[in-house]
Amino acid sequence: MTHYTTLLFDLDGTISESAPGILRSVRYGLDAVGIHETDEKKLRTFIGPPLNTQMKKLYGMKDDDIVTAITKFRELYEEKGALFDCSPYAGIGELLSLAKAAGYVLAVSSSKPEPFVKRIIENFGFTSYFDVICGSDPNDELNQNATMSQKARIIAKTLSLLREKGHDTARLAKEAVMIGDTGYDVDGAHDNHLPCIAVSFGYGSREELAAHGADAIADTVGKLRELLGLETGHE
């Protein structure tokens, strides 16, 4: 397997078990436009992809309703603190610590709005592990006209920020890998000519990850450590 030196991590479903706060906030946003969703399986599909993408896909919502629902989502999630209704997966902090100590370059590449990403990472005590913490523009979820997927744009932005910090372009191209939990992460990585190690302990199924062409799949944090060449230990 390729020896990776630069690790780009998704947040929700990869570093963070974030379902409780997101699901409450999605319900709150949908309720505001008269959609009273009770199917938790359907609600969980909102974890990872941009909110506007899922709202249009599942309900065919009009743009004005999408704006209203996202605004109400953020009211509960950000202003009322639901974003902190989450926790890091067991063993992920140790993995990050080991990777940093071993000389890996670490970055967060999440489609969650960047201010939320930074606050959650700080709340977990993980900020010092990362050279770059990259999320979406808070208004990007309202953009209906982008030709490149939001995840692909964020991964591209993450790589650009790493280059600006002096990391070698050729080495990034050969030795960087995306780590995420959905087909959306796999596709975004491949759109940037990066491999993707997918984790099935998040919100995407193993079948979904395989169907999107994940380069490897880790079912546990311990397996992810093994794939990254880090010493094994307790998960």
Regions found by a protein language model. Name each.
Residues G29-L30, P50-D63, I120, I154-L162:
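Helix-loop "lid/cap" segments that line or gate small-molecule binding pockets
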Residues M178-A218:
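Acidic, Mg2+-coordinating phosphoryl-transfer loop and its flanking beta/alpha structural elements
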